[in-house]
Every structure is written in structure tokens, then in C-alpha cells.
Regions:
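Structured C-terminal helix/loop/strand segments within mature extracytoplasmic catalytic/sensor domains
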Residues: 292-338
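Active-site SXXK
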Residues: 53, 70-96, 119, 175-179, ...
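Active-site-proximal alpha-helical segments within enzyme catalytic domains
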Residues: 171-178, 218-239, 298-314
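Active-site helix/loop module of the DD-peptidase/beta-lactamase fold
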Residues: 71, 90-127, 154, 183-218, ...
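Bacterial N-terminal signal peptides
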Residues: 5-16
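Active-site Gly/Thr loop motif
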Residues: 202-204, 256-309
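A short, well-structured edge-of-sheet supersecondary motif
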Residues: 35-64, 301-303, 307-311
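Catalytic-site signature segments of enzymes, centered on catalytic residues
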Residues: 66-67, 133-218
């Protein structure tokens, strides 16, 4: 675990001082991305590749267009983590504080005394497991509730906080509630002001639930290019076109693998604060990658050693091949670039 964390962090924050890797000529990248023009499953939407801060590859599939807003599903969790960081940078919250400090209604519930840090790393200890439909805090149960916010407060504890990783959308929903309470405005409004507008992202949609709460667990719709811009800001240590969006210190913490998950996730080795980590072998060279991931194969891959971002939108919701295909696209792009 420590070796993985150090490898990822050293690559992420040392790249800016290294010589820039030469980008693959646009024609070469076009040829790489064209491999997916005709596939068995017609639900790939877009791939955008940025290197050294510029778009070097962009392709749309199966009728998708540049202006299409696409639901990136749980990749929205990673955006929630960015918003937690921005609120932290502004002094609005601290992640070592319990949820109930900001969400007063949570006092007396199982989630109330849990530190936000454990919420962000899926170690809340609540009986919430999206892989188990019988779990009291399963995502489907929460989504079907008349009042999801009240539903969360009734989910019991299953383990001490900070001890067990269980992937679930309930805790990222809680993170969204905490941001809302800490900043005094809906999270999507906060996102517009401090994340999307500074990045020049003008067209987007973020769903709210039956309680009127922005869904911190996902259901954020973006254009593929804007999806990539989020990744480019992360790759550049929180800066985009000279503007500081979120602190480098926060990104170090959020992208550090705090939990080893390789035994339960075939596409990742570590989990930070709603961001994943994996090192790929590309032609015998280890290439550390961290990424946002959503159902269907929606990804923002950030590759510091290549100064690269690969954003993929896909509507293969609920289909295992969507994740496999996105990883295959990433590997093909990496294999074709220096």
C-alpha cells in the first residue's frame, strides 16, 4: 500500500519539472481512436485525449456530437471530492471533523459521528454496500426513498468507522450534503461558482433527488471536452489556464490511495477520496494512472508521466464490457504515445 502511494505521488508531482513528453501527431491519434468506429456494442459516445494541456485527439461515436451532455454516473463522485476540497480550501470544512458538525440533523444517527475523511474513502462503517441488493444502505433503496436525506439517517452501523471499505453511493451522497450545509447553498450552485465557471464549463446538468439535494453520488451530465478539462485541471495540480481552482495539497490527499482494493476491483488497485489508482504495464514500463470512474465505462484517466488526460463517455450502463472497453482504449492510447 505504501509503495503504491509513493509511486503514484512521486509521478504526479514530479512531472512538472521533467522534460515534456512529445505528443503523438494528431493523425496518429486519430488512427488509434478510429479502431472503435465499428464495434459489437454501439454505445461508446466519445473519447477526448489531452496532452501537455491541449487536445491531441477527439472522436465521437454512434451519432454522438461535441455538444452532447452525457451522464457520467459515478464519475460525478470524483467531482464531489473536488468540491469538498474547494470548500476545505475556503475554510468552510475540515475532513477530520464528524459529519454532524456540518449536518446537524445527523446527530444521533450512525453517520453523525463519522469523520468526513472516512466518508470520502468509503469507510464510514455503515451497512451500505452497492454490491449487495439486500444491504440496508444500497443505492437502489436510497434512490427509491421518498426522502433520501431522511433515509440515510436510518441506516445502521455495520463496522467501526475507518476499518472496512465498502463501495456505496450513500456516503458520497452524504459528502454532498456536508458540502451543501458547510457552504450554505446547494452543491450544484457552489459547483457553478467555484468549479465549472472558472473552468469555462457553461453547459452541464446535475440531478437533484427527491429531497432537493444535489446528488453527490453522481448523475452529473457534461460534454466530453469539459469532462477532459476537469481531468486536465487535476493533472496540473489544481490549476487551469493559470487559475488556481483547488489546492495541490488537497489533490495530493484525494489522489493518494488510502485503501487497497485490488482484491475486489479488477480495474483498480487503490482508492483515495472518490478517485481510483492503478499502475498499468505499457510495453514493459509501469505507468501510474488515477481516474474517475462511472457505470458504463465513463472515465477520466489522468496520466502524469505522459502529461496526459483521456476522457471517455459511454452509455454501456450496467454492462461489464463498458469498463473493459474503456481500459482497452486507455492502453491503446498509452501504447501509441511516448
Amino acid at each position: 500500500m505504501l509503495r503504491l502511494s509513493c509511486l503514484l505521488l512521486s509521478s504526479m508531482f514530479a512531472v512538472s519539472g521533467a522534460h515534456a513528453a512529445p505528443a503523438l501527431p494528431p493523425a496518429g491519434m486519430t488512427a488509434v481512436l478510429a479502431r472503435w468506429d465499428q464495434t459489437e456494442h454501439p454505445d461508446l459516445r466519445a473519447v477526448v485525449v489531452m496532452q501537455q494541456g491541449r487536445v491531441v485527439g477527439e472522436r465521437y461515436y454512434n451519432g454522438a456530437t461535441r455538444d452532447e451532455l452525457h451522464d457520467v454516473r459515478s464519475a460525478g463522485k470524483s467531482v464531489t471530492a473536488l468540491l469538498v476540497g474547494i470548500a476545505r480550501d475556503q475554510g468552510r470544512l475540515k475532513i477530520d471533523q464528524p459529519v454532524q458538525r456540518y449536518w446537524k440533523q445527523a446527530t444521533g444517527s450512525a453517520i453523525g459521528p463519522v469523520a468526513l475523511r472516512d466518508v470520502l474513502s468509503m469507510r464510514s462503517g455503515l451497512a451500505a454496500d452497492d454490491e449487495n441488493p439486500d444491504s440496508p444502505g444500497n443505492e437502489d433503496r436510497m434512490d427509491e426513498a421518498d426522502d433520501p436525506k431522511s433515509f440515510v439517517l436510518k441506516v445502521p452501523r455495520a463496522a467501526p468507522p475507518g476499518t472496512v471499505y465498502r463501495y456505496n453511493s450513500l456516503t458520497s451522497y452524504v459528502a454532498g450534503v456536508v458540502v451543501t450545509e458547510a457552504v450554505g447553498k446547494p452543491m450544484d450552485v457552489f459547483a457553478r461558482q467555484y468549479l465549472f465557471a472558472p473552468l469555462g464549463i457553461e453547459r452541464w446538468q446535475w440531478a437533484r433527488d427527491a429531497s432537493g439535494i444535489t446528488k453527490g453520488q453522481g448523475n452529473l451530465s457534461l460534454r466530453a471536452r469539459d469532462f477532459a478539462i476537469l481531468g486536465e485541471m487535476v493533472r496540473n495540480d489544481g490549476v487551469y489556464q493559470g487559475k488556481r481552482i483547488v489546492s495541490a495539497a488537497w489533490l495530493r490527499d484525494a489522489l493518494t490511495p488510502h485503501v487497497a482494493i485490488g482484491d475486489s476491483d479488477p480495474y483498480a488497485e487503490g482508492y483515495g477520496y472518490y478517485w481510483y489508482a492503478k499502475t498499468h504495464d505499457i510495453k514493459g514500463t509501469p505507468v501510474p494512472v488515477r481516474f474517475a470512474s462511472g457505470n458504463g465505462g465513463n472515465k477520466i484517466y489522468v496520466v502524469p508521466s505522459r502529461q496526459m488526460v483521456v476522457a471517455i463517455t459511454s452509455s454501456a450502463y450496467g454492462k461489464g464490457y463498458g469498463q473493459r472497453r474503456s481500459e482497452a482504449i486507455l492502453k491503446a492510447v498509452l501504447a501509441a504515445t511516448p
